[in-house]
Curated annotation (Swiss-Prot):
InterPro entries: NAD/GMP_synthase (IPR022310), NAD_synthase (IPR003694), NH(3)-dep_NAD(+)_synth (IPR022926), Rossmann-like_a/b/a_fold (IPR014729). Its EC number is 6.3.1.5. Gene3D superfamilies: HUPs. GO terms for biological process: NAD biosynthetic process. Mg(2+) binds at residues 38, 138. This is NH(3)-dependent NAD(+) synthetase. Homodimer. Deamido-NAD(+) binds at residues 113, 146, 153, 244-245. Keywords: ATP-binding, Ligase, Magnesium, Metal-binding, NAD, Nucleotide-binding. Belongs to the NAD synthetase family. Catalyzes the ATP-dependent amidation of deamido-NAD to form NAD. Uses ammonia as a nitrogen source.
Length: 254
């Protein structure tokens, strides 16, 4: 992986948040806090950038589990304002009005988009910016809900790979129990990122960095990492299949 000066990266991230709040002439920032390392890291950066009193965290569970405890741990450790909104009744009401059965993925997308709506409703009422929590690994592979968790005003972590976010989280003092637990979007019980993606973040990031940033040939990546070529091809396919998710809707030129 690339070698980063994490002290400089953190300074850059903090300055970025400060600048965008000032440029946008808003009173603060809001973000969804899931109990995972990405949202925790953004919360820690935001509190450092503009002060804890200008940061609002929304904890929006569908399932009541350890993630809620971890989300509250982040809020309480930082001393930021927060609200807990259980989205189960909202999602269930939506589902009741559909004339077809939802699978886990469709329901998960509705959950993610419900959270986006709640974030923007609160942001509009308070004149806040919405901070996104997506990282580069998710962004490049399309591991996010279009118009859901990908929707934000600014995304501080969007150019950092997941393994790099873990390193930044450690430096910022994010609790170890959050850093060390298996990453999950929390869309259904037992769901984990790496199970969905079919690859560990450590290997995924090594491949992505070489494919996208270094623009290495697939055969050379496989040789350098001592992995089968089809692993590299699989990651490449994730990037290609999700291209539409990284762009605004387009139409033909007239």
């Amino acid at each position: 992986m690339r070698s980063l000066d994490y002290a400089k990266v953190i300074t850059k991230l903090v300055s970025f948040i400060q600048e965008k709040v000032e440029e946008s002439n808003v009173k603060g920032v809001i973000l969804g806090i899931s109990g995972g390392v990405d949202s925790a890291t953004v919360a820690y950066l935001a509190a450092r950038a503009i002060g804890k009193e200008k940061v609002l965290g929304l904890v929006m569970p569908y399932h009541i589990n350890r993630d809620v405890e971890d989300a509250l741990l982040v809020c309480n450790n930082l001393g930021i304002n927060y609200k807990v909104i259980n989205i189960k009744s909202i999602v269930n009401e939506f589902e009741k009005n559909l004339d077809f059965e939802l699978n886990n993925v469709s329901r998960g997308n509705i959950m993610s988009r419900t959270r986006m709506i709640l974030l923007y409703a609160h942001a509009n009422s308070k004149n806040y910016l919405v901070l996104g929590t997506s990282n580069r690994s998710e962004f490049l592979t399309g591991y996010f809900t279009k118009w859901g968790d990908s929707a934000s005003d600014y995304a501080p972590l969007i150019n950092l790979y997941k393994t790099e976010v873990w390193n930044i989280a450690r430096i910022l003092g994010v609790p170890n129990e959050i850093i060390n637990k298996k990453p999950s979007a929390g869309l259904w019980e037992g769901q984990t990122d790496e199970k969905d993606l079919g690859i560990t973040y450590k290997l995924l990031d090594e491949i992505l960095y070489r494919l996208v940033d270094l623009k290495m040939k697939k055969e050379n990546i496989a040789r350098e990492l001592n992995i089968p070529l089809n692993k590299v091809e699989y990651v490449e396919s994730l990037i290609k299949k999700s291209e539409h998710k990284r762009k605004l809707p387009i139409g033909p030129e007239i």
